[in-house]
Amino acid sequence: MTKNPRTLYEKIWDAHIVERREDGSALIYIDRHLVHEVTSPQAFEALRQAGRPLRRPDRTLAVPDHNVPTTARVDSEGHLLPIADPQSAKQLAALAKNAPEFGVRYISATDPEQGIVHVVGPEQGFTLPGTTLVCGDSHTAAHGALGALAFGIGTSEVEHVMATQTLILTPAKTMEVRVEGKLSPDVSAKDLILHIIHSLGTAGGTGYAIEYTGEAIRNLSIEERLTVSNMSIEAGARTGLIAADEKTFAYLFGRPMAPKGADWEKAVQWWKSLATDKGAVYDKTVIIKAEDVQPSVTWGTSPEDVVPITGVVPDPASFADPAKQAAARRSLEYMGLEPGQKMEGLAVENVFIGSCTNSRIEDLRAAASVVWGRHVADNVKQALVVPGSGLVKRQAEAEGLDEVFKAAGFEWREPGCSMCLAMNPDKVPAGERCASTSNRNFVGRQGPGARTHLVSPAMAAAAAVTGHLTDLRHLEPVKMGEKA
């Protein structure tokens, strides 16, 4: 084991090496495996055909989330309602069969703890600092917010982890993204990560494991950190780590699957030792000034297409790279925008508050604080609030947030991935715009022809009540309990 100063990433990597290989890769032990209905059926079937057991069912957790409807799931007598889409129904049925057959804990669609895997993992204490965690889903990097080395894998790798609890991997380069200073009170973690992605570009993190550091990162709550780490993949990075600290330990203490008693004390001591050593050298360091971050919105079809809400649509000719110019022209055509057009005031027909990026209780509180005493604008046809899990939903209802949203004209839904992606009934109609708290604004991501503008929960709420993309700083402040 090297005694040279090491980064957080290097410490976790080194602790999980089973075997070093001549080509520089290594066989890495995987501590945790999250499974959902979309990328697991083929892997389970391959195990079944080969007569292999799942190596560590106790380190595996299965949760349906992508295809589940967010409307009622059972009828008045408690019977499951049928899933309309045949492919979705098949995938959900497969997970319901496969997980119990292979001894995996299965949180069903009707379980009060069901939700999006990247919300359920942390809140259950399944995600822990210093662990390696994988899922057949690109936004697995979210768990890095708790100091885990977490990343998405493909279906063939899902099978490999199920069978061996290992993966052959090549070590990533390390990148420090240091956010210096304090964020403005009107700036959210979503604004911060959109700003970072714009600064790095969607390929800027390719080949790197990002570690987020600096005063602004330390000041974030755990749920805000989860938002930042979640979108590391949109910057091209394999994962996005934040060193565990006292906030992390307080968040995890007492969680159902977190260590207990003496095991907890032992775990915390080890977690503390994982912080990047003084003198450790990153392959690259990027410095972000917190004061430069403003409430932001995407204008195009790439997560790097970000401007402040006070900004305008850029002219494709302003990009130096011809490929970027061409991409910008295609984006503007798809999005129905013109160079120089102001983002503020752009009408939206749909608003989505949810996804593994922004569906936790703090996100819903932020949105509700904007919605309170106001009503969804007449031109907004669809305004959904989709909690990230059953636990989040019940907490929000205990705080009365559901009533705030419903009184304002929002639909209050059951947990799931929902309108983040067009794999369930929640979609944006072709040609319509959506102010969305999700993580991707790709062509067709929210439905064929859908036009997505990525924003924070507070910005999405502001768009809903005004009917257009709005600088929330211009809204008359209203305290919960008062009238607008």
Swiss-Prot record:
Key words, A-Z: 4Fe-4S, Amino-acid biosynthesis, Branched-chain amino acid biosynthesis, Iron, Iron-sulfur, Leucine biosynthesis, Lyase, Metal-binding
Single GO MF descriptor: 3-isopropylmalate dehydratase activity
Broadest EC class assigned to this enzyme: lyase
Pfam families registered for this protein in UniProt: Aconitase
Cited CDD domains: IPMI
Residues noted as binding [4Fe-4S] cluster in the record, renumbered to the chain: 356, 417, 420
Pathways involved: Amino-acid biosynthesis; L-leucine biosynthesis; L-leucine from 3-methyl-2-oxobutanoate: step 2/4
Catalytic function, reaction form: (2R,3S)-3-isopropylmalate = (2S)-2-isopropylmalate
SUPFAM superfamilies the record matches: Aconitase iron-sulfur domain (SSF53732)
Co-factor binding details: Binds 1 [4Fe-4S] cluster per subunit.
GO biological process, one term: L-leucine biosynthetic process
Family, per entry: Belongs to the aconitase/IPM isomerase family. LeuC type 1 subfamily.
Alphabetized PANTHER family for the sequence: 3-ISOPROPYLMALATE DEHYDRATASE, HOMOACONITASE, MITOCHONDRIAL-RELATED
Quaternary data: Heterodimer of LeuC and LeuD.
Functional note: Catalyzes the isomerization between 2-isopropylmalate and 3-isopropylmalate, via the formation of 2-isopropylmaleate.
Entries under HAMAP family matching the protein: LeuC_type1
Name the UniProt record assigns to this protein: 3-isopropylmalate dehydratase large subunit
Organism: Zymomonas mobilis subsp. mobilis (strain ATCC 31821 / ZM4 / CP4)
